[in-house]
Amino acid sequence: MDLVTFLVLTLSSLILLSLWRQSSRRRKLPPGPTPLPIIGNFLQIDVKNISQSLTKFSKTYGPVFTLYLGSQPTVILHGYEAIKEALIDNGEKFSGRGSYPMNENVTKGFGIVFSNGNRWKEMRRFTIMNFRNLGIGKRNIEDRVQEEAQCLVEELRKTKGSPCDPSLILNCAPCNVICSITFQNHFDYKDKEMLTFMEKVNENLKIMSSPWMQVCNSFPSLIDYFPGTHHKIAKNINYMKSYLLKKIEEHQESLDVTNPRDFVDYYLIKQKQANNIEQSEYSHENLTCSIMDLIGAGTETMSTTLRYALLLLMKYPHVTAKVQEEIDRVIGRHRSPCMQDRKHMPYTDAMIHEVQRFINFVPTNLPHAVTCDIKFRNYLIPKGTKVLTSLTSVLHDSKEFPNPEMFDPGHFLDENGNFKKSDYFLPFSAGKRACVGEGLARMQLFLFLTTILQNFNLKSLVHPKDIDTMPVLNGFASLPPTYQLCFIPS
């Protein structure tokens, strides 16, 4: 048999095997478009705007359907009812973390966000408990955020009303908050180590949100054998790991088990207690990955939302004027905003909710996986199947939010101007995998934005109608365009 014949037979066998596997799986799974061998439905998906493709498929196949992103099936949940039924009503069964190959290659399943099974349960439980011990949800963490808000204002004053790109400054503020919780550090906004660390975090988010990364995660074999920006992710993560290991070593040398200072101290104490336990989850690897998760989620989510908020406030100056009028009336100019103010500021609260709804920061959420075979809406979903939830379909639901593509704080106000809650407000996801730092994130958004608007007027360099608010990347996350503005002291 010559080489050509052998290759043809091998390729044909692989295609037939792929077709057979897909056929047997598809008989049990929810409906969906017919996949091609090996590449699945990939050519039918717009990798620059996956959520838009999912909406298109949902019109044909309904709120629960199957796509093959490569050779593996992925169940898609579209719309509030399907997502609620899965993540809340069947939360435990949908609590697995779906495969995310690019990250798994480096973190090896450690940490909080991408771990599974007992490791995930243990780390999530530990994190929630010690966030409480460190004052999250209490007055002392509010004091810390207020202090950082004043540092942020002082840094913005240094721009002296000149045009500036706010990205770096808005990165530093939330980073300082989460770093003070994790290893009790407060960095100067010009600190080179912190800026380098944040550059790595920012670069990874941009790469992960690129169309190329959607290709890599669907075809994991590309990761090792093809050149591309995806290799930069591993280098950046390894840099961050080495930086954090130094911080951990410093903590080990100064640890006082009777007086824990921060998240790392609590972890090291737990590590000592678990020394005699077989297969303990409290390794240094797990700690470094957990801190990366906390800093990545706690900094990038916040700074991107703040950047988007300022862009939208310049685009819609009438909204800014209403918020500043409410700040003047409720808080005034002679004290710092506090969380008690929020209940007296329905328009400001509605504006912040609308920013999060409108920008739709993580359009398809992080992938879930079912932890056991499950019958869901008369379909059989095998254990381990990846599940994607379209948060876009909830946050931009036209029945709940009329004209969802419009930025309108009225989406969260009743006819009397009071704040109106919505079950469809799911920017932090829902269920067992919902963001552990949601409370802290809400606090920072309110205190940072009100403090900025209390002290400055926002001046755009272009006319409001010329401001473009469309995301420049819309993959893993929706990222706003870069822009400049002037912070004019008020």
UniProtKB/Swiss-Prot annotation:
Which amino acid positions bind heme, per UniProt? C435
Identify residues that carry Dimethylated arginine. R144
Triggers of expression? By growth hormone. P450 can be induced to high levels in liver and other tissues by various foreign compounds, including drugs, pesticides, and carcinogens.
> Which regions form coiled coils?
none
UniProt keyword Ribosomal protein, yes or no: no
Membrane-topology descriptor: Peripheral membrane protein
Q: List the catalysed reactions.
A: an organic molecule + reduced [NADPH--hemoprotein reductase] + O2 = an alcohol + oxidized [NADPH--hemoprotein reductase] + H2O + H(+)
Q: Kindly state a single biological-process term from the GO annotations of this entry.
A: organic acid metabolic process
Q: Family, per the entry? A: Belongs to the cytochrome P450 family.
Name of protein: Cytochrome P450 2C7
Q: What organism is the protein native to?
A: Rattus norvegicus
Print the organism lineage. Answer: Eukaryota, Metazoa, Chordata, Craniata, Vertebrata
